[in-house]
């Protein structure tokens, strides 16, 4: 079987000649952007020869201002494909696809709503403190925070669709928020789930497929039961 044929068969629970596989990593920062990133991806794909080739995304939602209170989230403006960080990732995808094995199942990395919401201020606080800050601000005054998250989600929907338009088979959606020690089940359902589903639906509507990556430790996988139909075993 060819690589893409093998992956699609596995997604449909059909017989395969072997289990399709892939490996992925965050490349060192010095080769994470621009031409260096293109070459590093191609080298990695050639050495690993995976069925699924995932293009990494280190082009993150940028800082838009200091955020110390829930009201400060109003500084997060709408994002679109015209933003430089999106243009940079689009260019990376184009250049990798121009030279990579198109017999493979090719996907882009789309950081989910939680990751993309904290990325603008993560350098200011550190990874765990900024995640705790997001939870705290949502509990204190959810309206301005959810408004900011909606603006981010709308932009991510555009990127998901663009990935498919460029020729990718879909996205790896990197979901956060399922960990028991941060959001409660009810908070996840209200604050996170609607945006996750909005973005994953955008990929499906564009003709792509989703691989759902549920990140981190102590994840309550039951929170994702209603996502069935949005990811690749549908």
Language model segments and positions:
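A short glycine/small-residue-enriched secondary-structure motif
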Residues: 58-76
């Amino acid at each position: 079987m060819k690589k893409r044929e093998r992956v699609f068969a596995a997604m449909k629970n059909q017989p395969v000649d072997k289990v399709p596989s892939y490996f992925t990593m965050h490349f060192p920062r010095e080769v994470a952007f621009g031409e260096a990133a293109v070459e590093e991806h191609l080298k990695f794909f050639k050495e690993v020869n995976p069925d699924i080739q995932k293009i990494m995304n280190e082009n993150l939602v940028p800082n838009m201002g200091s955020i110390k209170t829930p009201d400060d989230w109003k500084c997060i403006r709408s994002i679109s494909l015209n933003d430089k960080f999106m243009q940079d990732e689009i260019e990376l995808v184009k250049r990798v696809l121009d030279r990579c094995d198109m017999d493979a199942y090719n996907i882009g990395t789309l950081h989910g709503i939680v990751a993309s919401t904290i990325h603008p201020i993560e350098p200011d606080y550190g990874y765990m403190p900024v995640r705790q800050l997001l939870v705290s601000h949502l509990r204190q005054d959810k309206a301005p925070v959810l408004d900011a998250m909606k603006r981010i989600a709308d932009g991510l929907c555009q990127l998901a669709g663009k990935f498919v338009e460029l020729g990718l088979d879909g996205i790896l959606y990197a979901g956060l928020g399922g960990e028991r020690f941060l959001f409660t089940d009810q908070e996840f359902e209200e604050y996170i789930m609607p945006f996750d589903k909005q973005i994953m639906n955008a990929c499906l509507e564009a003709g792509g497929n989703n691989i759902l990556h549920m990140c981190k430790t102590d994840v309550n996988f039951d929170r994702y039961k209603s996502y069935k139909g949005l990811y690749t075993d549908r």
